[in-house]
Amino acid sequence: MREKLEALLSAATAELAHVATEDSLQDLRVKYLGKKGELTAVMKGLGSLSSEERPLIGQIVNKVKTELETRIDAAALQIREAGKAEKLRSERVDVTLPGRRLPVGTRHPITLITEEISDIFAGLGFLVAEGPEIEHDFYNFEALNFPKDHPARDMQDTFFISDTLLLRTHTSPVQVRTMLKQPPPVRIIAPGTVYRCDSDATHSPMFHQIEGLMVDKGITFGDLKGILTNFINQLFGKDTGVRLRPSFFPFTEPSAEVDIACVICKGKGCRVCKNTGWLEILGAGMVDPEVYRHVNYDAEAYTGFAFGMGIERIAMLKYGISDMRLLFENDLRFLKQF
């Protein structure tokens, strides 16, 4: 029995020397130490020994078992370490290689032009004000002197949510909300998203506006012209021609359309300006006293002006964009130009 155990240990040690993987090592462990392994079979034969031999052989069996477990565990550790070393060798990182650059986006042209316009008016003393896009009829129409039968209230022009709630058609409601919150003087611009039922090459059902308001004592139409001329000269160049044409808006009186000399032909006449030499960019006027009545301002003591422009139109003129829909299509070939 002693010789058999020594032979078993020698055979297991010899096989262990050729084991290179964890799977083959596990097979060897099962072969010798498993429930049906060779050492287990020897242990089952202890019962046939005499009472004098059994304790002695039992000690030898335990010693062989312990030795086998120790050698197998050592081999397992060696195999794992060898695997780690191979993985480190095959997967090593060359720190001298250039890094992988992540694609970096650019700011959208609408964002760029909005920030530029806001910066210009900030330099003229205007603050930025904001308001909700889902608006009440009172702020969007009634307080701005839109009669009940005004065409702008028609479903063809306005997205109504209910009888009194709608998607704002301009950012002028922000002006009303501001005047209701604070007394004069007021000097704000209100950039934001607006909605109208319209869609073609020059119109979108969702677009952006910046509207402005200035209310104080002694404000005149000359102040309006001076502010807007200063703004236009900063945005399009100091030599840009400016003209004002009479117009009509429910919430201003008198009202005007503001044109600039065509940025394409410099006022000489071309297809873009329809050979007039001028391009319309915004509407403006003196705040109608009826608006002051809705916000509890004293129309006898205070005057003011308001103006509004479509940001997409300004962007198209500033950057030479021919189709407004390009601003909403998220085409990287287009957006990467800014």
Curated annotation (Swiss-Prot):
GO BP, sorted A to Z: phenylalanyl-tRNA aminoacylation
Major subcellular location class: cytoplasm
Highest taxon, organism lineage: Bacteria
Alphabetically ordered keywords of this record: Aminoacyl-tRNA synthetase, ATP-binding, Cytoplasm, Ligase, Magnesium, Metal-binding, Nucleotide-binding, Protein biosynthesis
Cofactor binding note of this UniProt entry: Binds 2 magnesium ions per tetramer.
Reactions that this protein is recorded to catalyse: tRNA(Phe) + L-phenylalanine + ATP = L-phenylalanyl-tRNA(Phe) + AMP + diphosphate + H(+)
Family: Belongs to the class-II aminoacyl-tRNA synthetase family. Phe-tRNA synthetase alpha subunit type 1 subfamily.
Protein name as catalogued: Phenylalanine--tRNA ligase alpha subunit
